[in-house]
From Swiss-Prot:
Function description: May be required for cytoplasm to vacuole transport (Cvt) and pexophagy.
Free-text note on domains in this protein's UniProt record: The PX domain binds phosphatidylinositol 3-phosphate which is necessary for peripheral membrane localization to the perivacuolar punctate structures.
SUPFAM superfamilies: PX domain (SSF64268)
Entry protein name: Sorting nexin-41
Domain of life: Eukaryota
Family per similarity comment: Belongs to the sorting nexin family.
PROSITE patterns linked: PX
Species per Swiss-Prot/TrEMBL record: Kluyveromyces lactis (strain ATCC 8585 / CBS 2359 / DSM 70799 / NBRC 1267 / NRRL Y-1140 / WM37)
Positions of the PX domain: 101-221
Amino acid sequence: MNVFDGSDEEDNNPFSGTTHLYASGIAAVTDGPDDYDFTEPSINGSSDENAQSNAVAEPIEETDEPAEEIDDDTLQTWRFASAELSRSSAFETSYTNLLGQGKNPEVIRIVDAGQYRDIYGKYAIGYKIEFGGIVVTRRYSEFDSLRQSLCRLLPTIIIPPIPSKHPIIKYLFNPLHAKKDIKIIERRQRLLSRFLNNCHKVREIRNHIVFQKFLNPEYFWKEVLNTPPISILPMNNLLAPPLNPTKPSPIHLLLPTPTVLTMRKHEQLIGRNDVMEIKFADYDSDLIRYKAILQPLNKTVRSIRSNIQTYSAVLSELGAYFNAFSLENSVFQVSALFEQMNRLSMGIEKTGQAIDVNYVSAEIFSEAIMISLEEGSKEMLQFIHEAQRVLHFRNFKQEQFYTIETTIKKRKDRIRELKEADLQAVRLGEALKLNAEESPTVAQVMDSMTRKSANKNHTDKQIMGLFRSSASPNNKSGSDSISSEVEPHLLTKDERVVQVNKLEKELEKLNECFKLIEKDLQQVNESMDNSLNNLEKYFHEKWFLIFRELAHNITSWLKDCSESWKNAKQSIDSI
């Protein structure tokens, strides 16, 4: 099963395909604080878990919207883009023009969102994407599968976040409807539009064929997920080139697969005085500090927005009382008091209007805080999670490098010990031979040792011959591993020669692996360094936009409130 198959897995309903009451719909999200705007991917504990995460279990059935019968007049009948357009040249021209607009923050726009019927006859909420004069409609599940695909295709790139699926508990409430829950859909539409534009700002994503196919109305997304390059992705990106995981070399399959237990600590790596290690360690510590700042900030912003909403609700009720009280002058029929009561009524009415303006301004300000500061801080938190995922991948590639480097050093040391043992044996033999010529006693001892050694070798060969027919290849490898742990001077000359030949062959393969992993790690360092630098620039630009919008919204709020109270004061002064 394709883990990104989205047409059978309608976007959001875990009860689809069952007899549950809400099997055909999803639940509305409340207007209050929401912790589920962005998905936070878990950082895998080992490469084995990383491999398993790519082969996830079959997702639960979900539905974008109730599959109810809707009149064609009221339904937004968006046909799948491949049925509307059949013009690859037009798309290529538009996308080429789009690439030249990299500085435009809103190159790609989601111009509308609503119910549509796909080519399979299913109703779902679709998001109409417009760019360069071409329109394509995609569902939320297709956005989600696009992001998952990009994470696997570009493991060294920080992929922008998208809004998460709604939690299951919220499906127990009112089903989400394209016409009734406009605010919720607009929020997701805004976040998905931001996701596409953030992707477009990243050169590696912008130029990737999968992202271009997502924006091309001629491609069915289900077919894209079942064809290369997505369909030929390896189960474990650690055993593939980091910049092009769909084209692994045979040597990549020989690389070790590290786990968390074998990972080196930052202190050990920094102790090597490697400039890149120190640099990436600084990146990691900066992200941790940044996260420690953003998490309480996001919580505080939600609290402030909640307080402003409570304040606006109080103003709404208070303004209604003042407006009702201003109408009470009709009970006075005395002509002498009529003009005075009329001015009093006007002053009360203006006061009520000022309170109403404060109420409306507070609502607008609350919405502005949610869009700029709250959503912005959540998005940056998710970017930090994604950056940590990328750094985690680098740590595993780095562990592969050090594992191979350490293994090569051990093999070289063993070969040197074996060869030195041979030289020592030769020197010892020459010394004994020289002494034997001068001393008959030494000659007798050497002759006795030679006979014992010959008898021992003959006996060993006979014993091994008895068990050779029943021995398995594993037994041979076991004996080899035992002999590799034996001190060199305890081995015979033939055993040392065999072991040296074997180790030299292993060393050839290890050197090839070392050259490969060295190249991979260099590519990972360059790509991640560039990606993290871009993230840092994005954070600076994001904070500038957030504070500029926040200052503008605060100024507009105070200005509207001030003008309304000035008008009310003029009416009160005339009483």
